[in-house]
Amino acid sequence: MAVIDLDRQLQELRKEFARTAPAGRVALYESRIEELRSTFARHAALKEGDRAPAFSLPDAQGGTVSLSAALKQGPVVVTFYRGGWCPYCNLQLRSYQALLPELASFGASMLAISPQLPDASLSTAEREALTFNVLSDLGNDVARQFGLVYPLPQELRDALSSSNKALPSINGDASWELPVPATYVITPNQRISLAFIEVDYRQRLAPQRLLAALQEQAVT
């Protein structure tokens, strides 16, 4: 099966936004990405070799999914995304959906985590035809344990609100906090073998790199 060129799709989406969005909004988003690059405490985020925290979270169907149960079946890919309102997140989720047969060949499974309410997670799963677990991390509790959470500045709060993307209504809390997009590969002994953390939400872990990490793990 051909692997989706996620990097190319993300770049095309970025160019389309720059072409069609108001110049002031494009400049605002660019400046806030650079600001986050300098202020985000990357050293505090979990990295390769760290032990992943145990967690249990509600899924989009009303059940509960635990990392420990998933690890009993093999390696787990855990990806933190901002929410179904983010088009870059949706591109990533669709590309990872297409990877599921390859993941299964390594005995691996996928968990996607965002701070949005379960109803919003269900909408995301249905709209994007996702068959892996889409989990709701209310209050960013698990993302915080991974060291990924940051608050949005007022300008971004205003911009999202004006675009009908007010986070308090989507996430069910007034914190205006999000996780930095990140993808981890976690081994059955709960160790992190790959950590991809990127403050620029327009960049995500390429499917090819994810498969390479699983391949490397399979032969070690």
Whereabouts are the PLM-identified features?
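A short, polar/charged loop-to-alpha-helix boundary motif
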Residues: 199-217
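Short, small/polar residue-rich loop motifs at catalytic or cofactor-binding pockets
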Residues: 51, 75, 178-180
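Short active-site neighborhood of thiol/selenol oxidoreductases, capturing the structured segment around
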Residues: 67-96
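A generic structural motif
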Residues: 58-60, 186
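Thiol/selenol-based redox catalytic cores and closely related redox-interacting motifs
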Residues: 137-203
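Non-catalytic interaction/Regulatory regions outside core domains
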Residues: 4, 40, 123, 135, ...
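Structural microenvironment flanking redox-active thiols in thiol-disulfide oxidoreductases
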Residues: 92-145
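N-terminal targeting signals for export/organelle localization
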Residues: 1-51
